[in-house]
Amino acid sequence: MTKQENDIQKRFFNDNLQTVDVAIFDAINGEFKRQQHEIELIASENIVSRAVLEAQGSILTNKYAEGYPRKRFYGGCRFVDVVEDLAIERAKQLFGAAFANVQAHSGSQMNQAVFLALLQPGDTFMGLDLNSGGHLTHGSSVNMSGKWFDVVSYGVRKEDQILDMEEIERLAKEHKPKLIITGGSAYSRLWDWKRFREIADEIGAYLLVDMSHIAGLVAGGVHPSPVPHAHIVTTTTHKSLRGPRGGLILTNDETLARKINSAIFPGLQGGPLMHVIAAKAVAFEEALQPAFKNYSANVVVNAKTLAKTLQSNGFDIVSGGTDNHLLLVDLCSKKVTGKRAELALGRAHITCNKNAIPFDLQAPSVTSGIRLGSPAATTRGLAENEFVQVGHMISEVLDGLQMAKSDEDNNAVEMAVRKKVEDMTNKFPLYSYLPIC
């Protein structure tokens, strides 16, 4: 090897990102600044620990490990076997499940694996309607789940936006689905897992609970667990669970566990992402600590506080409040669309997402509401007092938008709120070991 080749070799292993790819470095640094200086209220987002970041950014990204611990199709897997075993055992302990698969790359893929394990194309299943708070993978017509299967959607009552269990039972008995899916991405009330299981048993269906949004609350003991009731439970590992982006599948049924394992590999995926599985294991260990119970309780308290503050300022909250980490704000009475609200709040450095409300007449790209969540801001350290202030800041921006002749006319209000946001976020720094360049 020549000296030049040796230098290149050394640089490959030792040059940092800023040296190798300044464009990507600048984008990451810009995102770091955004996260530091904005209040994150997207319900599906959270902020992970340094330990999770280190695990996910580790040399485990180099290792291929098709198969399962001690049953791999590649050599050199003795250490990644340790990692996956730890992730599995911690997940089982955290949720009180007999079996766990930690290999799903994402929430969509974990649910696809359940379909692959339990259904044939054309089979019937039931899931919560998207406008009632369901998820794309629960039967939306634009998703694979809605294209490959016969979907019967259920929803909420118009008068109170709560799940209509009588109608759900009627639909189940009429259509006799092979699978019933519960859980959603924008439903703020408790689920009656026991009642759903009774309905499933009566018609001979499987019950799948997708607890992606509330898994952290279940782990923290502030939300009823579906694990004793469901045939299969799926969850993403980020959101309220505060881990890396990925999926997790749980069951207490050994036969179903074997089907799930085969559906994930070789049915749906090849090699698992061992660096992500390591980060999942770290997050599960964090969630097993007493501090996580306090965190989960604070997430719910803060969401309730935000909902009550907005209600006191004249905003309509779907279903009248929340029992978990999220709330839907119905903006119809304010004559402001979800799209305009999201953009205006974004200019004020409050991040949320436009969201359809039950029986929404607006297009999905416009919507009549916004979805707000408390997990990320709670992770930063914001407490009830700060969430009251955040509620008032949201009210200022949206009331100003309602009164303004155009979005530009609301600029002074948005900039004044942005200054308040900056003052607040400066008190709650992220990753102080990292320099903001």
Swiss-Prot record:
Keywords: Amino-acid biosynthesis, Cytoplasm, One-carbon metabolism, Pyridoxal phosphate, Transferase. GO terms for molecular function: glycine hydroxymethyltransferase activity; pyridoxal phosphate binding. The record marks H238 as: Plays an important role in substrate specificity. It is found in: Cytoplasm. Its EC number is 2.1.2.1. Pathway: One-carbon metabolism; tetrahydrofolate interconversion; Amino-acid biosynthesis; glycine biosynthesis; glycine from L-serine: step 1/1. It catalyses: (6R)-5,10-methylene-5,6,7,8-tetrahydrofolate + glycine + H2O = (6S)-5,6,7,8-tetrahydrofolate + L-serine. Signal peptide: none annotated. It is an enzyme of class 2 (transferase). The modification N6-(pyridoxal phosphate)lysine is found at K239. One of its GO terms (cellular component) is cytosol. GO terms for biological process: glycine biosynthetic process from serine; tetrahydrofolate interconversion. Pfam families: SHMT (PF00464). PROSITE patterns: SHMT (PS00096). Belongs to the SHMT family. PANTHER family: SERINE HYDROXYMETHYLTRANSFERASE, SERINE HYDROXYMETHYLTRANSFERASE 1. This is Serine hydroxymethyltransferase. It comes from Bartonella quintana (strain Toulouse).
